Amino acid sequence: RREARLAAIAEAKAKIEARAEERDATEQAAYQEKVARREAQRKAGKKPRGRDPEPPTGGPRDKDQINFTDPQSRIMPVTGKGFDQCYNAQAAVDTESLLVTHVHVTQATNDKQQVMPLLTAWQGYPETLGKPDHLLGDTGYFSASNIQACHDHGIEPLLAMKRDVHHLPVFERFAADPPAPESEDPVEQMAHRLKTQAGRALYALRKHTVEPVFGIIKHVMGFRQFSLRGLDKVSGEWRLATMAWNIKRMHRLTAG
């Protein structure tokens, strides 16, 4: 029994180190992106806002853990509940039909790495399904690389650059559009777009689209948590849940 426990501990340690390497690579890429963006702003004669980013610290951390019940799950923040063992379920929803157009499940604790899988999936869809022209996402999806990736795929991104303000002051709500930036930087162009009347109206569709779908799946259809273990099985559960929503929604659409 002692040998088995030591072997399990050694295996857990190896997994923690492997996860730390993946996290280090992601954090280093994000750091380099921020540094490059600030340097580009300086070269353009603009002063970057805030302090320069601190380089990430590599290696395993004191709070890194392995779950022996479901090793593929990850500790993630849960709204109003602190932290729990979770998977990150993603879904893209069409703003007109409210049909789910793409789903996947990831072990990543944030959403910044989830834009490219979506764009890649959309690119492989049959032409008869049409092509999205905008991608609306909250601040969790914002990064300069995601904005550029959307443009590379012929899609205009509207990704919140800070937490949503639910009730804008009346003056801001009806203010004239600000002048367009002289810079062709995609991030600055998108920031301007989000400040225009048309851009705000378009982005506002997000809270009437994906949030109700998640809410109905949870509170009406009763799918509040995964019952199986492992990424593949959990992914299958999520596909079934969203498929059930699509069938429910298509029945509603065809019934008039």
Question: Could you tell me what each predicted segment is?
Answer:
Residues R1-G256:
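Anion-binding and metal-coordination hotspots
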